[in-house]
């Protein structure tokens, strides 16, 4: 089964607290390990929560310090492991300038290539079995959200139809299920569409980054299996949310409702809500009727395949 598992490395906004690290999210997507943001202390959190260090790519939502300064130490740790495979770093405009500085801080030279890529709204990074889409969002500086969208899976295999067509059980069944045609002994060709149902949609994971509620995010999160949305503030901090271009928990929930997202996880909490996020949860649940949770450091979510 193709794995899609999230581990929250840091769930605090702006500054670390005793209980919450700065922003970082590890996503195990199929055989890949991805990071979305890498705040200070992220590598220690990866050790603590057992994600491993075999990271293929890092996607930065923006370049406020609390979202990317952890990459400096993380790259050096990767070098000490003897890594030789390249790592890909993605982010909004200014990524090349800022991340080039991060790569070259310190005396040690990298033992592996570091490839830096700048993204804009609508750009797509293809991966094996899925793609990561960049979504322009509304923050104080250039910022992106991300939608991880799996390829559709083949439809269900109709065993009775396959048998009626004379397909022998065994490897031929597997080939058809993988989308490959099979030639029978009598010369007939059985195509995958002859024995498979309609394609089954892949999963969709959407990560807001720091943002005000915005139409682009609603569009990206349409029918998402999971929306991870920042919820820095509560209702009584609405003015502060607008001023700093962040979201309240209620606003995050409204995005989830308007998008028809299947599940909502709130993260990036102000220190005011560090140990007691119950107000955020209550306000979100008043706006959105689907499952909603407040993330904490070490919180893990595994998304099941769609039927």
From Swiss-Prot:
An annotated Gene Ontology molecular function: zinc ion binding
E.C. designation(s): 3.1.26.11
Pfam families: Lactamase_B, Lactamase_B_2
Entry keyword annotation includes Ribonucleoprotein: no
Record text on cofactor binding: Binds 2 Zn(2+) ions.
Catalytic activity: Endonucleolytic cleavage of RNA, removing extra 3' nucleotides from tRNA precursor, generating 3' termini of tRNAs. A 3'-hydroxy group is left at the tRNA terminus and a 5'-phosphoryl group is left at the trailer molecule
UniProt-listed InterPro entries: Metallo-B-lactamas, RibonucZ/Hydroxyglut_hydro, RNase_Z/BN
SS bonds (residue pairs): none
Reported cofactor(s): Zn(2+)
Chain residues that bind Zn(2+) 1: 62, 64, 139, 210
Annotated residues for binding of Zn(2+) 2: 66-67, 210, 268
UniProt entry keywords in alphabetical sequence: Endonuclease, Hydrolase, Metal-binding, Nuclease, tRNA processing, Zinc
Active site per the UniProt annotation: 66 (proton acceptor)
Family: Belongs to the RNase Z family.
Function comment: Zinc phosphodiesterase, which displays some tRNA 3'-processing endonuclease activity. Probably involved in tRNA maturation, by removing a 3'-trailer from precursor tRNA.
Subunit details: Homodimer.
The name this protein goes by in its record: Ribonuclease Z
Source organism of this protein record: Myxococcus xanthus (strain DK1622)
């Amino acid at each position: 089964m193709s794995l899609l598992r999230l581990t929250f490395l840091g769930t605090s906004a702006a500054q670390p607290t005793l209980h919450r690290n700065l922003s970082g999210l590890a996503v195990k997507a199929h055989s890949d390990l991805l990071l979305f943001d890498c705040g200070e202390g992220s590598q220690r959190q990866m050790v603590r929560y057992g994600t491993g260090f075999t990271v293929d790519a890092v996607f930065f939502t923006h370049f406020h310090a609390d979202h990317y300064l952890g990459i400096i130490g993380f790259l050096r740790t990767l070098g000490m492991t003897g890594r030789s495979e390249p790592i890909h770093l993605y982010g909004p405009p200014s990524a090349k300038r800022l991340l080039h500085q991060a790569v070259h801080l310190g005396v040690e030279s990298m033992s592996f290539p570091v490839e830096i890529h700048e993204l804009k709204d609508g750009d797509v990074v293809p991966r094996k079995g899925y793609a990561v889409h960049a979504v322009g969002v509304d923050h104080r500086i250039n910022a992106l959200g991300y939608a991880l969208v799996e390829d559709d899976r083949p439809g269900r295999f109709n065993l009775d139809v396959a048998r009626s067509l004379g397909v022998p059980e065994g490897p031929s069944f597997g080939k058809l299920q993988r989308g490959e045609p099979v030639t029978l002994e009598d010369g007939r060709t059985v195509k995958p569409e002859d024995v498979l149902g309609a394609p089954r949609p892949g999963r969709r994971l959407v990560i807001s980054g720091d943002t005000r509620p915005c139409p682009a995010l609603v569009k990206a999160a349409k029918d998402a299996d999971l929306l991870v949305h920042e919820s820095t503030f509560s209702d009584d901090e609405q003015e502060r949310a607008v001023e700093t271009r962040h979201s309240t928990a209620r606003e995050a929930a409204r995005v989830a409702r308007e998008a028809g997202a299947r599940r909502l996880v709130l993260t990036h909490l102000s220190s005011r809500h560090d140990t007691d996020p119950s107000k955020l949860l209550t306000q979100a649940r008043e706006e959105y009727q689907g499952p909603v949770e407040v993330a904490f450091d070490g919180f893990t979510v595994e998304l099941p395949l769609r039927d």
